Regions:
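Short hydrophobic/aromatic patch on the recognition helix
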Residues: 257-258, 262, 307-308, 312
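Terminal helix-turn-helix DNA-binding modules in bacterial transcription factors
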Residues: 228-241, 245-246, 264-306, 325-327
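Short, conserved beta-strand element in jelly-roll/cupin
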Residues: 56, 73-89, 132-134
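Alpha-helical bundle regulatory/interaction domains
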Residues: 1-5, 87-90, 94-222, 227, ...
Length: 327
């Protein structure tokens, strides 16, 4: 099942989706028919330039959403919050898929509509994600920051082209669950949703405001394609530290540009990002695999287990042994 659209200020996902699949739409609520699966899609209009789309369903077929880049310039931004337990495949420009879920460093995506993307939702898997659509001018007014850093300045500037990723903390996950559970029959439901969405945006932009205050490069489809190729290379063997000269040569980008765009997009240097992913995998293996601390350390390429223990404690606040024994 494929749903394809071209990004624009006028595009309304829930209306076009209901027409394409012949599903009735009532009060901006679309119930997934039993023939397709179960769940719903809900739109909440929070203002002329501010809206929310809630996706919560389990489908019988793989579901692919293809977003084509906007034909005309627009200052509409899309902010995706992936609250899935299971990773989703996100593809830019037909490159290899990148895994996204609430548990990784890229669970939140902030992007302009001039970038194409393909998201694949696997069949028989619970899908939960929220999309906030807002114009840069409306967002600038909401944030009300007198002296924004370069990241916030770029995001709230009309005509900019960018893609940013952020991790999702427990607070954000709880807010998303609260939003999905709001009773929309309540007279003040829209107001409550707006309060919660603003809280959601506060946590996101508070983190983005703490990023290094350096000049931001415009990001284009070809750049996004190369950055995801680099990310995939890093994730393909997290027991092997990334070597920037080789990465730059592989994707055909200068080392300087690669380092700057990667840090700009993912919020950290290539090596630090690699270490975060490495520690996330260590935490998962310690809890789920039944491996011993030494087995996890060696599996992730650590020859010195003391170094592994110190690094893990730096990220998680406890030693691997203590972490593996806690519930």
């Amino acid at each position: 099942m494929i749903f394809e659209f071209t990004a624009s200020l006028q595009f309304d996902f829930i209306t076009d989706f209901s027409k394409k699949y012949g599903i009735s739409l009532r009060n901006n609520y679309l119930a997934i028919p039993a023939s397709m699966g179960e769940g719903f899609v809900r739109k909440v209009q929070l203002g002329n330039d501010f809206r929310l789309m809630i996706h919560h369903y389990k489908l019988k077929e793989d579901f692919i959403i293809k977003r084509n880049p906007a034909v005309e310039p627009s200052d509409l931004l899309s902010i995706f919050f992936y609250n899935n337990e299971q990773p989703l495949d996100l593809v830019y420009n037909q490159e290899k898929p990148v895994k996204f879920s609430q548990k990784n460093e890229s669970a939140i995506q902030v992007t302009t509509n001039d970038l194409s993307s393909v998201i694949r939702f696997p069949a028989h898997t619970e899908t939960q994600y929220v999309v906030v659509g807002v114009t840069s001018s409306e967002l600038r007014s909401m944030l009300g920051v007198d002296k924004p850093n370069q990241v916030l300045k770029t995001i709230t500037t009309t005509g900019a082209s960018f893609l940013y990723f952020e991790s999702m903390n427990t607070e954000t996950q709880q807010i998303l669950k609260h939003i999905a559970a709001i009773n929309m029959n309540d007279d003040l439901s829209n107001f409550l949703v707006q309060v919660k969405v603003q809280e959601l945006l506060y946590h996101l932009f508070h983190k983005l405001s703490k990023r290094e205050n350096i000049s931001q490069r415009a990001l284009y489809n070809v750049d996004a394609e190369k950055l995801f190729e680099v990310r995939n290379i890093i994730l393909s063997d997290i027991g092997e530290p990334p070597y920037i000269p080789t990465l730059a040569t592989t994707v055909g980008m200068s080392e300087t540009k690669l380092k700057q765009l990667f840090k700009q997009t993912f919020g950290d240097t290539i090596y630090n990002y690699y270490q975060k992913i490495r520690m996330e995998e260590a935490a998962f293996l310690l809890k789920q695999s039944g491996y011993s601390v030494s087995e996890v350390g060696y599996h992730l390429g650590f020859s010195n287990l003391s170094h592994f223990s110190r690094l893990f404690q730096k990220h998680y606040g406890s030693t691997p042994k203590k972490y593996s024994s806690t519930e």
